From Swiss-Prot:
Record PTM Phosphohistidine, positions in chain: 277
Matching Pfam families: HATPase_c, PhoQ_Sensor
Induction remark: The phoP/phoQ operon is positively autoregulated by both PhoP and PhoQ in a Mg(2+)-dependent manner. Repressed by RcsB via sigma factor RpoS.
Alphabetical list of PANTHER family matching this protein: SENSOR HISTIDINE KINASE YKOH, SENSOR PROTEIN PHOQ
Gene: phoQ
GO cellular component, one term: plasma membrane
Result of changing residue 277 to V: Loss of autophosphorylation, irrespective of the presence of Mg(2+)
EC number: 2.7.13.3, 3.1.3.-
Consequence of changing residue 277 to N: Abolishes autophosphorylation activity
Protein name: Virulence sensor histidine kinase PhoQ
Cofactor(s) needed for function: Ca(2+); Mg(2+)
Length: 487
């Protein structure tokens, strides 16, 4: 049973709709058909009884009672409403008169039928019916066709019993009128028989119509399924919001979910890219130190602190970026601690001197010890590390660092004697993946990360020309008042 349910119950919506609707139509059709058949049967019986009762009244009117005998004289031009066979009984059930002497018919009249007015039926065979229809050639032809199709077919004759009370001219009589044409040969009965075929044809016609209705009704769901497949194949980014009213809420929620997932994916991808870029400097220092150890230019005792410092920085950077990934987009600063700027820059300069040792970069700094940075230390190190690394990469020999501080802003200036940045590219270098010099190795990430961090401090980075002949980067950190609260 469970196996059957697993294989057959999870049907498609179209099949479910079709089966459910077909079931409803079938039940309603059968119900209406049964009601129609019962109604027709009752109406048919009433109509037949009324006609036979009319024949009975006619014979009662034409009957004469003389010398304790009854006689019936039928006019020659009398037009009977229907071919019938009439029998007249007295109150004791004795047969007084019969229109024709047909023994099997007389025996078929049950004594209990004669006790009350009523409507009955006599079941017989084709041969017996043929004796009743001896004078009706049209009915005989129809009966012949029935005999050819089924020699054992049963015929049903309607019987009406009417009791007439005694009067001055007539004793109590019971008149039995038998319809000589069986129900099976009547046109009305054939209509009844055809009703079943009409019902079956109706169902066969309804099923394809229901299929078309199901196909048309479920087209929006098919379209939605197709769009989902296109999403899986990366052929579309969002679901079409122009859909039916019932699916609008679902599509809107799915689009919101897709947007959230895409933003989260982009956030972590960006964070991973930024982390990879930030680890380049400490890894380069480790590589330079190991090279010095291999060439015996540095002793183990001197190399160990340098390597431990860079390993510690790598660990800090990983923790910092994981935390930053969870806070990205919130607009809330990680901390508002006070950090002297000069020591932080000294550590960066020391690391960069090791990275660019072969190039022989000369980095000079002119910063007052009182100048401080308010915020997360790793934010400052990340921004200035990227800006200084760019300056060292593109300078010829000299890099100069200076700073000034106002009530709410910290300005740090980094200048080099390199080729500088063309005016047309000064805004592009802060976009991810964009670089002013595409001939040198790089990813175009450092300055983009620096700008994103400074914007969190309501600051900016401004590129201009330096008096040294190269580029001048002005890094501005806002929100530098120690007592300032986040809005």
């Amino acid at each position: 049973m469970n196996k059957f349910a697993r294989h057959f119950l999870p049907l498609s919506l179209r099949v479910r709709f079709l089966l459910a609707t077909a079931g409803v139509v079938l039940v309603l059709s059968l119900a209406y058909g049964i009601v129609a058949l019962v109604g027709y049967s009752v109406s048919f019986d009433k109509t037949t009884f009324r006609l036979l009762r009319g024949e009975s009244n006619l014979f009662y009117t034409l009957a004469k009672w003389e010398n304790n005998k009854i006689s019936v004289e039928l006019p020659e031009n009398l037009d009977m409403q229907s071919p019938t066979m009439t029998l007249i009984y007295d109150e004791t059930g004795k047969l007084l008169w019969t229109q024709r002497n047909i023994p099997w018919l007389i025996k078929s009249i049950q004594p209990e039928w004669l006790k009350t007015n009523g409507f009955h039926e006599i079941e017989t065979n084709v041969d017996a019916t043929s004796t009743l229809l001896s004078e009706d050639h049209s009915a005989q032809e129809k009966l012949k066709e029935v005999r050819e199709d089924d020699d054992d077919a049963e015929m049903t004759h309607s019987v009406a019993v009417n009791i007439y009370p005694a009067t001055a001219r007539m004793p109590q009589l019971t008149i039995v009128v038998v319809d000589t044409i069986p129900i099976e040969l009547k046109r009305s009965y054939m209509v009844w028989s055809w009703f079943v075929y009409v019902l079956a044809a109706n169902l066969l016609l309804v099923i394809p119509l229901l299929w078309i209705a199901a196909w048309w009704s479920l087209r929006p769901i098919e379209a939605l399924a197709r769009e989902v497949r296109e999403l899986e194949d990366h052929h579309r980014e969002m679901l079409n919001p122009e859909t039916t009213r019932e699916l609008t809420s679902l599509v809107r929620n799915l689009n919101q979910l897709l947007k959230s997932e895409r933003e989260r994916y982009n956030k972590y991808r960006t964070t991973l890219t930024d982390l990879t870029h930030s680890l380049k400097t400490p890894l380069a220092v480790l590589q330079s130190t190991l090279r010095s150890l291999r060439n015996e230019k540095m002793s183990v005792s001197k190399a160990e602190p340098v390597m431990l410092e860079q390993i510690s920085r790598i660990s800090q950077q990983i923790g910092y970026y994981l935390h930053r990934a969870s806070m990205r987009g919130s607009g809330v600063l990680l901390s508002r601690e006070l950090h002297p700027v000069a020591p932080l820059l000294d550590n960066l300069i020391s690391a960069l001197n090791k990275v660019y040792q072969r190039k022989g970069v000369n980095i000079s700094m002119d910063i007052s010890p009182e100048i401080s940075f308010v915020g997360e230390q790793n934010d400052f190190v990340e921004v200035m590390g990227n800006v200084l690394d760019n300056a060292c990469k593109y300078c010829l020999e000299f890099v100069e660092i200076s700073a000034r501080q106002t009530d709410d802003h910290l300005h740090i200036f980094v200048e080099d004697d390199g080729p500088g940045i063309p005016h047309s590219k000064r805004s592009l270098v802060f976009d991810r993946g964009q670089r002013a010099d595409t001939l040198r190795p790089g990813q175009g990430v450092g300055l983009a990360v620096a700008r994103e961090i400074t914007e969190q401090y309501a600051g900016q980075i401004i590129a201009s020309d330096s008096l040294l002949g190269g580029a001048r980067m002005e890094v501005v950190f806002g929100r530098q008042h120690p007592t300032q609260k986040e809005e």
